[in-house]
Amino acid sequence: MSAIEQVSRPYAASFVEFARNRREVLCLSADLTNSVEIDDFKKVCPDRFISCGLSEQAMMGVAGGLAREGLLPYVHTFAVFVTRRPYDQVAMSIAYPNLRVHLMGFLPGLTTPGGVTHQAIDDIALMRVLPNMTVVDCGDATDVESVLDATEDVDGPVYCRILRGRVPRLFREPLELGRARVLESGDDVCLFTSSVCTGEAMPAVAALRAKGLSIGHVHVSTLKPFTDPAVLEAVGAARRGVISLENHLVTGGLGSSLAELMAEQAIGHRLVRMGLYDTYAHGGSLSYLLEYYGLSARHVVDAVERLTGERFGIELERAAESEGAPSTEKAEAL
């Protein structure tokens, strides 16, 4: 398997390129400018950079007011501080009036060693239930680089989970809103992944296919709306069952979206959900946390074996640093 390209700070460059000549775009920061890779924009366009300080609730109100005036605010902070802390303001000042505010959440799920205070493991669930909200979960550098263009014209609020630091490039084609990436097709089992779990799962899928299992692999970046016909087609084709793997609680995220879709379409396949089960996570490296909480490549193989009742004799490294994992370097702002 060829080495995976690692891209340094993909959001920093793409946001400057996207916003430089769009005078309506304003950049809001909650005192985490370097940590969410908007320091370059601050230097290039200081007149459109607004520092709101460590006051996320107020920042959401500011963003809503700017949007009412016809401007296009992009709010930047850690994912947990976009969702959990100012949730009422997001709901009442942004989602309820259906304003064009883009909420950019960094350090999603287990991608920080900062522990429970900094790990957004419930953010997709919180944002999915808000009427009018679009939800996107980036899985590689290409997703990060293209999410701004892909969501620019959404007529309402958008929440994006953004990877930072050194991020793997898994895909060449840009993200398309509402469209999943079908990485492999198969009619035995289909694995649906999102966020950093897609890169983690790739070696497992390759090993299983080499053993003769017809396993499909679909990367999902748009969690709401969840209406891509390709997802429904892949679910229907998987005669032995479906597996979801996500950097989030199993409640309210990708697994729940699949369960709802399958129930509504009367698809009676078994669904195995892999993610955090009714637990908060503790601090650690990404590779360690994926292993500890059962989200690593070898756990994907285990899940497929339980689902099919077969043994494939695949041995994958335990707790190895995944090539597809973003670094935990500078994982917390100090």
Could you say what each language-model-derived stretch is?
Residues 1-161, 166-167, 179, 312, ...:
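Thiamine diphosphate
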